[in-house]
A protein has these predicted regions:
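N-terminal beta-strand/beta-hairpin edge segment
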Residues: 85-141, 146
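Hydrophobic lipid-interacting interfaces of membrane-associated proteins
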Residues: 64-77, 108-114, 137, 141-146, ...
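Short helix-loop boundary/capping segments
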Residues: 173-226, 240-241
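Short, hydrophobic/aromatic-rich segments at coil-to-beta transitions
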Residues: 57-66, 100-106, 205-214, 233-236
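Gly/Pro-enriched, hydrophobic low-complexity segments
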Residues: 87-89, 112, 119-120, 206-279
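Sec-dependent N-terminal signal peptides of Gram-positive bacterial secreted proteins and lipoproteins
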Residues: 4-26
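Acidic/charged, solvent-exposed loop-and-adjacent secondary-structure segments enriched in E/D, K/R, S/T
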Residues: 142-191
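N-terminal leader/targeting segments and the immediate start of mature chains
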Residues: 19-104, 262-280
Length: 280
């Protein structure tokens, strides 16, 4: 009996120490547990940067939701008749239950309100269903059963539907990318999976062949973004959203990656289960 009490006491002490270490470091994301092994955030970003710099587009598993932005020639498009231009076609079907890549990007997005720099109007919450084609900074949309409409301002209002689209072209600047992330609610792309967050601080640093920056907000929320420059026809914008909404388990966190990349067209499917990281 005495030995049993000593054993239980030892287990209780170890559990208490483990909880303390988990709670203290869960406040700032410093390490991730992927596939049972720990990897630092810097090493994680470096690995992603290395994969993307070498045009490795096979990095897809049950951990990630993935959206691809494809660079296609005019001959492959029936929407663009000008042979002097190329266009970026977003393709994919984003849902929480599945991710199937198709010829057009059909989607359902809940967008949070933000201020339009074009007309100063405040855009409220809306739900958008349709498809989008971006042509050298100009946007062609098909909403519901309407025809394609051309818009070069980046913001379109039609039938109480609002969206924000930004193209990654040769003229894209890192400041444009930063503004895109700051102004657009990335979490809304998950169609209500997580709440809307407001990011308060931003850190910026270089990674191989591109940039990376981090947006941090309240409630232990962090958005890590990598932007790979690559060649003129291969540009990648990757977003890693780390959240911790659990009040009873500070050592648990959910990470979701939404990747927009230039790539060749192909059909891919991804599992539906969300990635869970344990943090120290």
């Amino acid at each position: 009996m005495k030995r049993r009490i000593m054993y239980l006491s030892f287990i209780a002490i170890l559990s208490f120490c483990f909880l303390l270490s988990g709670c203290n470091s869960a406040i700032s994301i410093s390490a991730l547990h992927i596939g049972g092994s720990e990897i630092s955030k810097d090493a994680f970003l470096a690995e992603i940067a290395e994969r993307e710099a070498y045009n490795d587009r096979q990095f897809i598993s049950e951990q990630w939701y993935r959206v691809k932005m494809q660079t296609l020639s005019d001959k492959e498009s029936s929407d663009n008749k000008n042979s002097d231009n190329s266009y970026l076609s977003i393709s994919g079907n984003v849902m929480l239950s599945s991710l199937q890549f198709r010829s057009k990007f059909r989607f359902s997005v809940n967008s949070e309100s933000f201020n339009s720099q074009d007309d100063g109007a405040e855009i409220t919450k809306n739900k958008l269903s349709g498809q989008v084609t971006c042509v050298d900074g100009e946007i062609y949309t098909k909403l519901k059963d309407t025809d394609y409409q051309k818009n070069s301002g980046g913001i379109k209002k039609s039938d109480n539907v609002t969206y924000f689209c930004d193209t990654l072209t040769d003229n894209s600047d890192i400041n444009d990318i930063i503004e895109l992330i700051k102004n657009f609610d990335v979490a809304a792309l998950l169609d209500g999976y997580i709440d809307s967050y407001r990011f308060e601080t931003m850190s910026f640093f270089r990674v191989p062949d591109g940039y990376a920056f981090s947006l941090s907000g309240a409630d232990k929320v962090q958005l890590v973004v990598t932007y790979m420059e690559g060649s003129s026809r291969v540009k990648t914008l990757s977003l890693y959203l780390f959240t911790d909404k659990s009040s009873d388990s500070l050592a648990s966190s959910t990470s979701t990656k939404l990747e927009i990349s230039a790539s060749t067209s192909r059909r891919i499917s991804a599992p539906s289960n969300k990635d869970k990281y344990k943090m120290r």
